[in-house]
């Protein structure tokens, strides 16, 4: 594998930040293997995201959220040297879309931030969610919280914004690395998954609507 971008994205030992893994022998580890096997076999991505017979939706969603977090994290990591306070003073997706940060700690009101600052806060926030046993339980038999899908929708909507920013503001870097096809595959996988289970509002998908229509339909 000569492409340096691919080495980073698919090398399991190289991560932008600590990677959440599934414990061998657990139900979710088996689901993770099943999902990866479908992708590696070249199965149509629309089919690959469908819930396998006999599996629980929350388990399937949890596995994919962690996987998407890891992949999007790495994609952003490869272009992050060109995403600076100066180049991207506002987290946006072109002139029409500005993304403001809000959380339960320092930023209780939607706040305009630079893209790198927004990304930092976002990745930290998602990491806290997926490592919280009360939200993403790892033990089989431990129930998911009632608001699990609500939390997931927020995570995935915010991860989608990373795709928006990367495609609109940093695609030249992706092209320079010769990695368009591989980033596009990650995006298609993500898009098919969130639309299969209705995990992102249509209005959130609007910034990449034209590209998605060409790529995913």
From Swiss-Prot:
Pfam families: Mob1_phocein. GO terms for cellular component: cytoplasm; nucleus. It comes from Bos taurus (Bovine). InterPro entries: MOB_kinase_act_fam, MOB_kinase_act_sf. Zn(2+) binds at residues 83, 88, 165, 170. This is MOB kinase activator 3A. GO terms for biological process: signal transduction. Transmembrane segments: none annotated. GO terms for molecular function: metal ion binding; protein kinase activator activity. Belongs to the MOB1/phocein family. May regulate the activity of kinases. Coiled coil: none annotated. Keywords: Metal-binding, Zinc. The keyword Zinc applies. SMART domains: Mob1_phocein (SM01388).
């Amino acid at each position: 594998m000569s492409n340096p971008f691919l080495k980073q994205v698919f090398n399991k030992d190289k991560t932008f930040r600590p990677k959440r893994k599934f414990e061998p022998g657990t139900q979710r580890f088996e689901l993770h293997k099943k999902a990866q096997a479908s992708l590696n076999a070249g199965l149509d991505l629309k089919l690959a995201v469908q819930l396998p017979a006999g599996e629980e939706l929350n388990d399937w969603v949890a596995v994919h959220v962690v996987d998407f977090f890891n992949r999007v994290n790495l994609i952003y990591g490869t272009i992050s040297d060109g995403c600076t306070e100066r180049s991207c003073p506002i987290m946006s997706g072109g002139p029409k879309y500005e993304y403001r940060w809000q959380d339960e700690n320092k930023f209780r009101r939607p706040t305009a931030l630079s893209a790198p600052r927004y990304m930092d806060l976002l990745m930290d926030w998602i990491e806290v969610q997926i490592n919280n046993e009360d939200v993403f339980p790892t033990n089989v038999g431990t129930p998911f919280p009632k608001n699990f899908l609500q939390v997931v929708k927020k995570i995935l909507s915010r991860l989608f914004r990373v795709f928006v920013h990367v495609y609109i503001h940093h695609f030249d870097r992706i092209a320079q690395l010769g990695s368009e096809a591989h980033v596009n595959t990650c995006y298609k996988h993500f898009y098919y998954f969130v639309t299969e289970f209705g995990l992102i509002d249509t209005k959130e998908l609007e910034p990449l609507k034209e590209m998605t229509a060409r790529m995913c339909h």
